[in-house]
Swiss-Prot record:
InterPro entries: AMP-bd_C, AMP-bd_C_sf, AMP-binding_CS, AMP-dep_synth/lig_dom, ANL_N_sf, CaiC. GO terms for biological process: carnitine metabolic process; fatty acid metabolic process. It catalyses: 4-(trimethylamino)butanoate + ATP + CoA = 4-(trimethylamino)butanoyl-CoA + AMP + diphosphate; crotonobetaine + ATP + CoA = crotonobetainyl-CoA + AMP + diphosphate; (R)-carnitine + ATP + CoA = (R)-carnitinyl-CoA + AMP + diphosphate. Its EC number is 6.2.1.48. GO terms for molecular function: carnitine-CoA ligase activity; crotonobetaine-CoA ligase activity; medium-chain fatty acid-CoA ligase activity. It comes from the Bacteria. The gene is caiC. Belongs to the ATP-dependent AMP-binding enzyme family. SUPFAM superfamilies: Acetyl-CoA synthetase-like. This is Crotonobetaine/carnitine--CoA ligase. The keyword Acyltransferase does not apply. Keywords: Ligase. Catalyzes the transfer of CoA to carnitine, generating the initial carnitinyl-CoA needed for the CaiB reaction cycle. Also has activity toward crotonobetaine and gamma-butyrobetaine.
């Protein structure tokens, strides 16, 4: 069944411009407070100009172009401008440093880069020291340096016509993007995403939150991340809604932005919820238009209840990963919600819990969460130039092994326990890091928490807790361990405690456990 009607991204934008015309499509707010607004007609024209810019620089169908940008209008222009001419976007996490960025450039085979002033010196160094296929750099926001192979994105774009000059034949099976995974445990892998994937993601995510053309979807998630692209942007555009892209998340500014733009949908991760909760209470906490808050793992029930009560919102749970493109398990619009369940499989998907021998398990049994979709359509196509890694997680019949541990109940509701790699082996017992973190997070002095396993010559692994305290608080080891002993089984109590100012996180707010020992 062809859910998207054979429509690729070029057709999508031409149709959106015709149907919605002068309706607001995109609002971008920079960290300095500068706001840019574009109607559907204007945004399509900017996308066309950007496509023509790439064509004048020699980019053709199948070429890869890297983007190393914070949230900005140019990211949207480039994303869809490349898609219109059949070229492939390679977004780079804006937090990555030289070695990591160089690795992605080389392994993606990108021949052109679009970036900004703050990142340009790093890429100068990369060009001097590393072998890459990079031929040209476009800068979006600075006077041009006297370097060969560097040009002004804005100047070149403004010289282009608003109608598309190069329109090669496109198929929904064509690759639109190679998105490298966050690599919290290993080298990132390039997730190949097709035009079909993105079109499907728009329809699916719009269905998931019952999105309408009069909605306003605000996100502070980074544009180089799958959540921003597929859960937010593609959903908003596919529904003819307004998409608000904020450059950087600020707990102090967030509710003001929600109120200013009259946002009806937004998305949150646990780090955001915890930092919003430590802001001083305000009489305006409930003065907003939010209908749904899309939420991604993982939060204790106490934290969830406190957040929903204070801000008068409800969380719409969505579970997925880069490889699934969208939240393939989640709460459904209009259905009952069963916290702490992550919901039920969405339409077009099947979900099972499987054992270590790849056999389906009955309700209540703990195992790996596995999802069935259609590669290149409802789930990712493959890992770029990595068939071995693809075969490890994706079966020929479309079953995807998530690497996550969970279980389901008799009614088909699924429950996430932990990443399989985050299960600690302690004296023959399996201990979930997430379970411990949710318990410890309930301590009134603790703002943030992560637990990891460290080598133990007697019990396989010992448990170490890293905590960030609320401002002005102190916490003794005696008080911490007493709290743990009162709230968890003895074999789950951490052996070590380290208090830190912050925890290392990647672009999506996930804690980078490999940096903690």
């Amino acid at each position: 069944m062809d859910i998207i009607g054979g429509q690729h991204l070029r057709q999508m934008w031409d149709d959106l411009a015709d149907v919605y015309g002068h309706k607001t499509a995109l609002i971008c707010e920079s960290s300095s407070g500068v706001v840019n607004r574009y109607s559907y007609l204007e945004l399509n024209q900017e996308i066309n100009r950007t496509a023509n810019l790439f064509y004048t620089l020699g980019i053709r169908k199948g070429d890869k172009v890297a983007l190393h940008l914070d949230n900005c209008p140019e990211f949207i222009f480039c994303w869809f401008g490349l898609a219109k001419i059949g070229a492939i976007m390679v977004p780079i996490n804006a937090r990555l440093l030289r070695e990591e960025s160089a690795w992605i450039l080389q392994n993606s085979q990108a021949c052109l880069l679009v970036t900004s002033a703050q990142f340009y010196p790093m890429y100068q160094q990369i060009q001097q020291e590393d072998a890459s296929q990079l031929r040209h750099i476009c800068l979006i926001d600075m006077a041009l340096p006297a370097d060969d192979g560097v040009s002004s994105f804005t100047q070149l774009k403004n010289q282009q016509p608003a109608t598309l000059c190069y329109a090669p034949p496109l198929s929904t099976d064509d690759t639109a993007e190679i998105l490298f995974t966050s690599g919290t445990t290993s080298r990132p892998k390039g997730v190949v995403i097709t035009h079909y994937n993105l079109r499907f993601a728009g329809y699916y995510s719009a269905w998931q939150c019952a999105l309408r053309d009069d909605d306003v979807y605000l996100t502070v998630m980074p544009a180089f991340h799958i959540d921003c692209q597929c859960t937010a942007a593609m959903a908003a555009f596919s529904a003819g809604a307004t998409f608000v892209l904020v450059e950087k998340y600020s707990a102090r500014a967030f509710w003001g932005q929600v109120q200013k733009y009259r946002a009806t949908i937004t998305e949150c991760i646990p780090m955001m919820i915890r930092t919003l909760m430590v802001q001083p209470p305000s009489a305006n906490d409930r003065q907003h238009c939010l209908r749904e808050v899309m939420f991604y793992l993982n939060l204790s029930e106490q934290e969830k209840d406190a957040f929903c009560e204070r801000f008068s919102v409800r969380l719409l749970t969505s579970y997925g990963m880069t490889e699934t493109i969208v939240g393939i398990i989640g709460d459904r619009p209009g259905d009952k919600r069963r916290w702490p369940s992550i919901g039920r499989a969405g339409f077009c998907y099947e979900a099972e819990i499987r054992d270590d021998h790849n056999r389906p398990l009955p309700a209540g049994e703990l195992g790996e969460i596995c999802i069935k979709g259609v590669p290149g359509k409802t789930i990712f196509k493959e890992y770029f130039l990595n068939p071995k890694a693809t075969a490890k997680v994706l079966e020929a019949d479309g079953w995807l092994h998530t690497g996550d541990t969970g279980y389901r109940d008799e009614e088909g509701f699924f429950y996430f326990v932990d990443r399989r790699c985050n299960m600690i082996k302690r004296g023959g017992e399996n201990v979930s890091c997430v379970e411990l973190e949710n318990i410890i997070a309930a301590h009134p002095k603790i703002q943030d928490i992560v637990v990891v396993g460290i080598k133990d010559s007697i019990r396989d692994e010992a448990i170490k807790a890293f905590v960030v305290l609320n401002e002005g608080e102190t916490l003794s080891e005696e008080e911490f361990f007493r709290f743990c002993e009162q709230n968890m089984a003895k074999f789950k109590v951490p052996s070590y405690l380290e208090i830190r100012k912050d925890l290392p996180r990647n672009c999506s707010g996930k804690i980078i456990r490999k940096n903690l020992k």
